[in-house]
């Protein structure tokens, strides 16, 4: 039995059908699609540019501009949807970098036998990334508490100065060396038995906080950049408590003491065993040596 289709329905479905058909033809012909959703992912200056979609019948090449506004090719003819640009942006973290992702026809495509950055005298389709200023835009990594001590009415905390991928004279610089006094730390602390929190800010890597004597405190720290209006703070460090630290130190000292004691006993027993062997050998040699006649 034949199914009747209304002319109006056919007219409505025609554009959709033709659009799908056109997309299939384009994909089959290897005509590249422009990248979209270009996003900078950066922490402590480790910087990757990500985008979509996954390519079919074409590749991507990333270009980034330097201070001379020259375009440099990176991740040439890649099928990945990300490109590590760390080695370029750490050259000057105060420069606003421009980047773009080019969609380049693959080999044996309709445009020729090889991946080309120029097609019929024109640049292939590309998408510009947002400008990226590393000093302002890189995220701060999670800080690490290097050491702390509760001494009477003072809680002293030292934050580890993290290394970055920024180099000077072949040496990696710390966050402090990059940001100077613009880098600060926030400590959030509370009594171990309380939920009420207090904060303190320093532009160094050390805190000295007034606390109650004999009371346990829990705290965590965050890095911050004073000059930033957005993206100012890092994630918080792991939370630690002074009583936990004392317990940890006690357990550590017990373990270390036990290891030292066992090592000492082993050395003593080994020494006794070696001495006995030497005496036995000396006695054996004495028996085997013939007596001289007077």
UniProtKB/Swiss-Prot annotation:
A lipid is attached at residue 275 (S-palmitoyl cysteine). Disulfide bonds join 75-83, 218-241. GO terms for biological process: blood coagulation. Residues 29-251 are extracellular. Induction: Expression in the liver oscillates in a circadian manner. InterPro entries: FN3_dom (IPR003961), FN3_sf (IPR036116), Ig-like_fold (IPR013783), Interferon/interleukin_rcp_dom (IPR015373), Tissue_factor (IPR001187), Tissue_Factor_CS (IPR030472), Type-II_Cytokine-TF_Rcpt (IPR050650). Coiled coil: none annotated. It is found in: Membrane. It is a single-pass type I membrane protein. Keywords: Blood coagulation, Disulfide bond, Glycoprotein, Hemostasis, Lipoprotein, Membrane, Palmitate, Signal, Transmembrane, Transmembrane helix. Residues 1-28 form the signal peptide. A motif (WKS motif) lies at residues 245-247. PROSITE patterns: TISSUE_FACTOR. The chain crosses the membrane at residues 252-274. Glycans are attached at residues 37, 57, 169, 200. Residues 275-294 are cytoplasmic. It comes from the Eukaryota. Belongs to the tissue factor family. Initiates blood coagulation by forming a complex with circulating factor VII or VIIa. The [TF:VIIa] complex activates factors IX or X by specific limited proteolysis. TF plays a role in normal hemostasis by initiating the cell-surface assembly and propagation of the coagulation protease cascade. PANTHER family: INTERFERON/INTERLEUKIN RECEPTOR, TISSUE FACTOR. Interacts with HSPE; the interaction, inhibited by heparin, promotes the generation of activated factor X and activates coagulation in the presence of activated factor VII. This is Tissue factor.
């Amino acid at each position: 039995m034949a199914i009747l289709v209304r002319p109006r329905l056919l007219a409505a479905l025609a554009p959709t059908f033709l659009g799908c058909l056109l997309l299939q033809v384009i994909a089959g012909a290897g005509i590249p699609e422009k990248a979209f959703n270009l996003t900078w992912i950066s922490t402590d200056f480790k910087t990757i540019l990500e985008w979509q979609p996954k390519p079919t019948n074409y590749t991507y090449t990333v270009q980034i501009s330097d201070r001379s506004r020259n375009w440099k090719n990176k991740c040439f003819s890649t099928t990945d949807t990300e490109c590590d640009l760390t080695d370029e942006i750490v050259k000057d973290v105060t420069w606003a970098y421009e980047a773009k992702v080019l969609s380049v026809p693959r080999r044996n495509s309709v445009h020729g036998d090889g991946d080309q950055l120029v097609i019929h005298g024109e640049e292939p389709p590309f998408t510009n990334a947002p400008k990226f200023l590393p000093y302002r835009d890189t995220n701060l990594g999670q800080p690490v508490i290097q050491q702390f001590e509760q001494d009477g009415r003072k809680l002293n905390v030292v934050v580890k100065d993290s290394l970055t991928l920024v180099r000077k004279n072949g040496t990696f610089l710390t966050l402090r060396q990059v940001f100077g006094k613009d880098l600060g730390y926030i400590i959030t602390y509370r009594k171990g038995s309380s939920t009420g929190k207090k904060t303190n800010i320093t532009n160094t890597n050390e805190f000295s906080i007034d606390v109650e004597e004999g009371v346990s405190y829990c705290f965590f720290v965050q890095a911050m950049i004073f000059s930033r209006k957005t993206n100012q703070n890092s994630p918080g460090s792991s939370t630690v408590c002074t009583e936990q630290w004392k317990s940890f130190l006690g357990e550590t000292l017990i373990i270390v003491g036990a290891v030292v004691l066992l090592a000492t006993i082993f050395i003593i027993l080994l020494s006794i065993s070696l001495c006995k062997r030497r005496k036995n050998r000396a006695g054996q040699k004495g028996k085997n040596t013939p007596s001289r006649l007077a």
